[in-house]
Amino acid sequence: MQNDWIKLKEFFIYIFLFIDKTNVESITMWNLTQNEYLTLMVGVWIVILFLTWFLLWMVFKIVGYFK
């Protein structure tokens, strides 16, 4: 059972941190600490969720015009 929790934790970490820290550092030439990297990833997820919400809002708004 403990092994399942470890696998689940690793899965969520893999999904949440979908951009590898070394890739971010090589693309941007930044030298990030772990805390800065986590803050950056939280910001990326906030932007992704906002854009998803905005896209869905626009779709429902456009569909509402045709009713």
From Swiss-Prot:
Lineage: superkingdom: Viruses
InterPro entries given in the database record: Phage_1-C74_Orf10
Keyword Calcium: no
Membrane-spanning residues: 10-30, 40-60
Signal peptide feature range: none
Keywords per UniProt: Host membrane, Membrane, Transmembrane, Transmembrane helix
The keyword Nuclease is assigned to this record: no
Membrane topology, as annotated: Multi-pass membrane protein
Pfam families assigned: DUF2649
Main location: host cell
Location(s) in or outside the cell: Host membrane
GO cellular component: host cell membrane; membrane
Similarity section: Belongs to the plectrovirus ORF10 family.
Protein name (database record): Uncharacterized protein ORF10
